[in-house]
Amino acid sequence: MFRAFATFWMLQNMDNLQKNAQLTDFYQNLAYKPYCSEDLYYGLRVRPKDIAVLKPYIQGNQPSMMHYFFFDIDREEAVLAWFDADLPRPYWTAQTSKNGHAHICYKLQLPLCTSELGSKKAISYAAKVQAGLATKLGADVGY
């Protein structure tokens, strides 16, 4: 399933990749041509990842491989929702300065194959874990 998240804080230029292990990891785990958008009103486009990472919205997981759980939390001080819910520390958080809304990312220890070749039990279990985290975080379930 497609998940997009805002990358406004991420990549101003490619030099940031050498400075931040999380950005390097994210870049390496991206699809070769992820969906991305400058403005969601105009829809999504498939672009090479070196172009896609410069867009405000990007597909965070590969089409058939899940590396991360992304959560969109639309309330003030949402960046600490994981702490307030007594959950493990996320891989990264990003907060919008104008309203305090946030994105929270958890990295899976092992990538999960989500294609028809993947384990149905593992996919089902991951979906339940993701739904449980979303509920505890008070995240947007439609994200």
Where do the protein language model's features map onto the residues?
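Signature for HUH/AEP ssDNA processing cores
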Residues: M1-A102, L108-S124
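Flexible helix-coil linker/hinge segments at domain or subdomain boundaries
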Residues: A127-Y143
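Short C-terminal domain-edge/linker segments immediately following a structured domain
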Residues: N99-C105, A134-A139
